Curated annotation (Swiss-Prot):
Region (Involved in Mg(2+) ion dislocation from EF-Tu): 80-83
Disulfide bonds: none
Domain of life where this protein originates: Bacteria
Name assigned to this protein: Elongation factor Ts
PROSITE patterns (UniProt xref): EF_TS_2
Cellular component terms (Gene Ontology): cytoplasm
Family designation: Belongs to the EF-Ts family.
Gene: tsf
Source organism (scientific name): Aeromonas salmonicida (strain A449)
Amino acid sequence: MANVTAALVKELRERTAAGMMDCKKALEEAAGDIELAIENMRKSGQAKAAKKAGRIAAEGVIFARTEGNVAVMIELNSETDFVAKDASFMAMGQKIADIAATQKIADVDALKAADFGNGESVELTITNLIAKIGENMNLRRVMLVEGDNLGTYVHGSRIGVITKLTGGTAELAKDLAMHVAANSPQFVKPEDVSAEVVAKEREIQIDIAINSGKPKDIAEKMVEGRMKKFTGEVSLTGQPFVKDPSMTVAELLKKEGADVVSFTRFEVGEGIEKQETDFAAEVAAQIAAAQKA
């Protein structure tokens, strides 16, 4: 067996960020050849990362980038908020957003296949960081919007918005992106609210009125007024502007000679069922697994 020195173990730890015992074992198996040890660890690290893929990555960060008339937003997930704040994770996420913007990539699979700039794909770069940190990660989605007046806003790394305007200023586009982040409208304008959503809300409001003791015909008349208020509340242009509630967004747009074409809002983990762990059961399972080993 080759003589594995403390200096070799230290160098391997620095180059791989793996644990001391893992590094010592890898060097012993590679007969002291550090390059072979790294190659073997990368192979086993990727296999180890693949095993983690079943774990739920419901934390993460929203990254945004504007490049000329292109705005891009991505969601990169991790299992814990701690890893989402890691410098390597943050740098990788911003680089992926930059790649999507400069290469105009609007598809997740295409973005995963893109060159990260280090001779490896985006997907492999993510996999390598999974192996290094020991926690599952996932490039969940990407949105690309093209237009002459685009606004992006990211709040606390967890909520991101892209707005697309005709007319107006870049500042207005960003202000409206901030508004969407804060107020979470579902539609651009009241007339965009789908018939299905309106019908469902009308039914709910009629039931509320009837249950309060109103006759059905009176209840139906009351609800018509409420429905107009409802469609305004769930649409961007019908809401009071977040920076000046004395005017609606529609009034602001008229004043600025602008219109909103679209908006996209991402929030970290939305739609992902987060796994709730019974800590006592998890510890018991780990002890049982250790006893079997």
